[in-house]
């Protein structure tokens, strides 16, 4: 069984037992969270789509870790104008382990 969930403005296809890195969720390590925004649920060749959400469906997950992605380097430059700008960015993430899908 799998589900498509929406969290942090993005959509993820998840199944029980998988690990997943999502946008940062303010929760302690080891805390159990519920993802309520389930867009689709599937098992085998049967799929149930929501309009926009599947009613009564939820995904239970456990927070494994909180961390930061690798640095992304941004470099802007205007030719012949002696303008250069360097910037870096590290996005925070939360790593989840999917425990169960309730449909």
From Swiss-Prot:
Database matches in PROSITE patterns: RIBOSOMAL_L21
InterPro entries attached to this UniProt entry: bL21-like, bL21-like_sf, Ribosomal_bL21, Ribosomal_bL21_CS
GO cellular component: cytoplasm; ribonucleoprotein complex; ribosome
SUPFAM superfamilies the UniProt entry points to: L21p-like
Ranges that cross the membrane: none
A molecular function GO annotation: structural constituent of ribosome
Presence of the UniProt keyword Chaperone in the record: no
Any GO BP annotation: translation
Keyword field contains Oxidoreductase: no
Entry keyword set: Ribonucleoprotein, Ribosomal protein, RNA-binding, rRNA-binding
UniProt function note: This protein binds to 23S rRNA in the presence of protein L20.
PANTHER family named in the record: 50S RIBOSOMAL PROTEIN L21, LARGE RIBOSOMAL SUBUNIT PROTEIN BL21M
Family matches, as HAMAP family: Ribosomal_bL21 (MF_01363)
Family the entry assigns: Belongs to the bacterial ribosomal protein bL21 family.
SUBUNIT field: Part of the 50S ribosomal subunit. Contacts protein L20.
Protein name (database record): Large ribosomal subunit protein bL21
Organism listed in the record: Cupriavidus pinatubonensis (strain JMP 134 / LMG 1197) (Cupriavidus necator (strain JMP 134))
Lineage of the species this protein comes from: Bacteria, Pseudomonadati, Pseudomonadota, Betaproteobacteria, Burkholderiales
Gene transcribed to yield this protein: rplU
